[in-house]
Amino acid sequence: MKKRLYISIPITGMEEKSRIKAAQLQKHFEAQGYEVINPFEIGFHLEKLHDLCGHKPPTWANYMEWCVWALRSCDIIFFCVGWACSKGCTVEMEESIKFKKEIIYE
């Protein structure tokens, strides 16, 4: 059974750069045999759901709820450089510790 790996990456203020990096990391880890959870894919589905339901665009808190939910289903959390300066990544770190996830750093 493949291990699930979540990518924790700073996003706010550098969305496009982070999207590209997350996609590269996803390919890298998938080539190593991991099932990878990319937060940008979570965001894409959340945005589509809000649109289909006629809701306002998702808030930062909505994104974090979904990301934390996905993180909890993973075995390993990969923290990218800069995570400690990111509000979202620090929330993900707290959850990783709380749920005793294996943590690796870039």
Predicted regions and their residues:
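Conserved catalytic or regulatory cores that recognize and/or transform ribose-phosphate-containing ligands
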Residues: M1-E106
